[in-house]
Amino acid sequence: MMKLKSNQTRTYDGDGYKKRAACLCFRSESEEEVLLVSSSRHPDRWIVPGGGMEPEEEPSVAAVREVCEEAGVKGTLGRLVGIFENQERKHRTYVYVLIVTEVLEDWEDSVNIGRKREWFKIEDAIKVLQYHKPVQASYFETLRQGYSANNGTPVVATTYSVSAQSSMSGIR
């Protein structure tokens, strides 16, 4: 199923969820700093770069394309962290790790909509995401659990469902 957006065709899975892809863009393989971008809707808020998949596009290809458009970075695509479901917004997002190897001075969203980017330590990224993007904050928790659950070998997560109400209850 597809729906036309101003600049792209949206694709949906069999359950009617929008198919999305995103990357946790790390400065190095140590995965200590991650790149976030300003939201197009709320420029004072930070988000994980990602977006809708195009028809017939593989999730990994969409993830790399989206981070180049939104964050102006290229790199080495790594493991799939998981497939995250946002029940409130009806999205399913494939989230990958990307180790940044090239940072573009000017990129599509910086030129077109003035999007900004900034490096964050993981704990700080979680803090800035947890209130307005709890599903995105959960990407980092899953990343951590993947390492600890298998002695440093990442465990590929299946679908995670986070509703705004359940995720906010754990925040103090």
Curated annotation (Swiss-Prot):
Q: What is the effect of changing residue 78 to V?
A: Loss of diphosphoinositol polyphosphate phosphohydrolase activity
Question: What is the activity's pH dependence per the UniProt entry?
Answer: Optimum pH is 7.0-7.5 for PP-InsP5 hydrolysis. Displays strong endopolyphosphatase activity at pH 6.8 and 7.4.
| Residue window of motif Nudix box | 51-72
**Activity regulation behaviour:** Endopolyphospahatase activity is inhibited by NaF, NaPPi, beta-glycerol phosphate and heparin. 5-diphosphoinositol pentakisphosphate (5-InsP7) inhibits its mRNA decapping activity.
Question: In which family does this protein belong, per the annotation?
Answer: Belongs to the Nudix hydrolase family. DIPP subfamily.
Effect of changing residue 52 to A/V: reported as: Loss of diphosphoinositol polyphosphate phosphohydrolase activity
Q: Where does tissue-level expression of this protein occur?
A: Widely expressed. Expressed at higher level in brain, heart, pancreas and liver. Also expressed in placenta, lung and kidney.
Q: Where is the active site?
A: 69
Which cofactor does the UniProt annotation name? Answer: Mg(2+); Mn(2+); Zn(2+)
Binding positions (Mg(2+) 3): 66
Q: Provide the residue positions that the database annotates as binding Mg(2+) 2.
A: 66
List of residues that carry N-acetylmethionine = 1
Q: What is this protein called?
A: Diphosphoinositol polyphosphate phosphohydrolase 1
Q: Does the keyword Repeat apply?
A: no
Q: How does it assemble?
A: Monomer.
For this protein, the record's Pfam families field holds: NUDIX
Q: Where is the Nudix hydrolase domain?
A: 17-142
> Which species is this UniProt entry from?
Homo sapiens
Binding residues for substrate, per the UniProt record? 10, 18-20, 39-41, 89-91, 115, 133
Task: Please name the GO terms of the biological process aspect recorded for this protein, alphabetically.
Answer: adenosine 5'-(hexahydrogen pentaphosphate) catabolic process; cell-cell signaling; diadenosine hexaphosphate catabolic process; diadenosine pentaphosphate catabolic process; diadenosine polyphosphate catabolic process; diphosphoinositol polyphosphate catabolic process; diphosphoinositol polyphosphate metabolic process; RNA decapping
* Functional summary from the UniProt entry: Cleaves a beta-phosphate from the diphosphate groups in PP-InsP5 (diphosphoinositol pentakisphosphate) and [PP]2-InsP4 (bisdiphosphoinositol tetrakisphosphate), suggesting that it may play a role in signal transduction. InsP6 (inositol hexakisphosphate) is not a substrate. Acts as a negative regulator of the ERK1/2 pathway. Also able to catalyze the hydrolysis of dinucleoside oligophosphates, with diadenosine 5',5'''-P1,P6-hexaphosphate (Ap6A) and diadenosine 5',5'''- P1,P5-pentaphosphate (Ap5A) being the preferred substrates.
Which Enzyme Commission numbers does its entry carry? 3.6.1.52, 3.6.1.61, 3.6.1.10, 3.6.1.62
- Sites where the protein binds Mg(2+) 1: 50, 70
